Amino acid sequence: MQVSGTIVVILMAANVEAKIYERCDLAKKLEAAGLNGFKGYTIGDWLCMAHYESGFDTSFVNHNPDGSSEYGIFQLNSAWWCYNGVTPSENLCHMDCHELLNRHILDDIMCAKKVVSSESGMSAWDSWNQHCYGYDLSEWLRGCHMNAKPNKKIIS
């Protein structure tokens, strides 16, 4: 009985650092980090992708059939972008995957910028291809009261 209580306390402590962002709060963080217009993508692109990848949840982890895992708000893959101690990794962002699971998303943003700077751009995220590419993304900024302009054009 005491062991299960200890496990609950440990899990609660781990989640204290996690955060599920509100859409407009995340939009403002992304804009402040310079993502609006970065490599031709708007805050709408980033919000749409993050919504479909993680539901804006910084603690989200997805385990893939190939043995790799995806971490954090942008679901950065352990085979390429971070090191999780399990999956052989290129670790192109030079970071531990677990650093992507807290409320402090500047490191996530810096790594996501590397992903977008690669040849694939935002096409690296299947969710962006399926749900965001070619769509009117203005709804993602509706009501956020910020300077970022939504992208209404199709990126080619």
Swiss-Prot record:
It comes from Bos taurus. This is Sperm acrosome-associated protein 5. The lineage of its organism: Eukaryota, Metazoa, Chordata, Craniata, Vertebrata. The active site is at 53. Belongs to the glycosyl hydrolase 22 family. The gene is SPACA5. Residues 19-147 form the C-type lysozyme domain. The keyword Transit peptide does not apply. Keywords: Disulfide bond, Glycosidase, Hydrolase, Secreted, Signal. It is found in: Secreted.
